[in-house]
Amino acid sequence: GTKKLWIESANRDADLALKVTKKIDEAQAELTPDTDLVIEDRKEPSSAIEVLEELMADPAWSSCVTVLPSAIKGAEESVFANLKQLKTYLLRLASFAAARRTRRGTTNEAIAEENGLGGVYRRAVSFTAETKYAEDYIARWNGAARIFGEHLTVGFSVNNARCFSAHFLFDQHSGKIVIGRMGKHGCCTRSNS
């Protein structure tokens, strides 16, 4: 009965995690290419929105991550330059979501660290950001305006070409990460974005 369904669900999540991990390994290989390997006729994304669109078209990634229109708009406006790094972290975000489905009782920070997000993951925005600059972190999900406090920040600069943020929540019902805001770093106590 219930135990069998749980085991089947865990097996599906494990298979999905393996697929996502393979994609992460492929992206990591792009970050540190083997000098003997030559890849021809492969169009690299030229913008953050192209990276996002490529991932959203991937069934394994999109089974772990939902991207809201507000985040797509932010990616369209983004001038972030390190697109290979962005792709790697967004792939890891899918792996993070798959792990959170089955790792109840483990802190999100520990799961993030295990999935290669330790240096860029934060579980919440600051109190000042959430209160004074809330509009930079709000998106609508399931009919309600919500603060998307969990986030990844790639790079640490007020220069939008060198810093990229993705703000999200974990939807318990679907077991997916929902990205509500993406692109430039929102205002907080340490930025003037």
Language-model features, listed with the residues they occupy:
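Basic, Lys/Arg-enriched alpha-helical interface segments
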Residues: 1-164, 171-193
